[in-house]
Amino acid sequence: MARPQPNVLVNTDHGMMIVNRLDYALAPDGKSGYGVGFQLLNKGNYDPEEINLVKFLAKDMADQLDRPITMIDGGANIGVHTIEWAKYLNHRGRIVAFEAQEHIYHMLCGNAALNNCFNVKLFNAALGAEEGWLEIPKPNYNDTGSFGSMELKQHDKSEHIGQDLTKKTTVPTMAIDDFEFQHLDFLKLDVEGMEMEALAGADETIKRCKPRMLIEIIKIDRAEISGWLAERDYTAYPFAGNFIAVHKSDSMSDRITSENGVISIS
């Protein structure tokens, strides 16, 4: 019986990585594709501008603080951000990463090990408003699909990832507040429409620690999240389908601007 081999080892700009070669969906034009695996296999990297911006913001914090910084990668996928941050910061920081899809989580763990990232803590869980369990789709990883685009909570307008999602599985949900982090310096949320729920579960931590944030806004209401952030004295700066959120007490707030989605830092 044939045994498919979708996972391959790829020498990317981010280091050696386990990548699913079927991690892609075709764009509406039927010619171009998208997906984390697609970018890594066809370009050698994944969203380098976003990676470099976050690394700059992290280094800026690490330079100011007389302690290691803590960063959360919410929706880590196979770990491009996690690995880049971990290698860049080394002993100057630790990364806590969450990935809900079990098979992708296995790849995340493998990639952290391959790149000798000893300053990471990885969880196979979704981020939400509270601890619990969530039934999510279970894609076929032996077939093509943009697995990172899959919404854990499906609805009529959910993005089609390139394959039908008929099977289900159950995963734990975790709330960031339950970890009672002493410090949280940076929070990334790319959780395919569950960003507001993840923020609700991190509300007390955000109020106390005032982390810098990168929040994907493609599948959520911009006005809602802008209002939520403003109520907590954050300014949201648009950046390539995301908000960079900076608290008004942060020294970065006097240095950062955004125009037409382009971030400038003085």
Segments (PLM) and residue ranges:
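S-adenosyl-L-methionine
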Residues: 1-174, 181, ...
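Short internal loop-to-helix segment that lines adenine-nucleotide cofactor pockets
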Residues: 35, 39-70, 135, 151-209, ...
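Hydrophobic pocket-lining residues within nucleotide cofactor-binding pockets
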Residues: 76, 127-129, 176, 191, ...
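Short, conserved active-site loop motifs that form the nucleotide-linked donor/cofactor pocket
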Residues: 93, 120, 184
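A SAM-dependent methyltransferase catalytic signature shared across enzymes that methylate proteins
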Residues: 117, 227-238
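Conserved S-adenosyl-L-methionine
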Residues: 123-125, 234-242
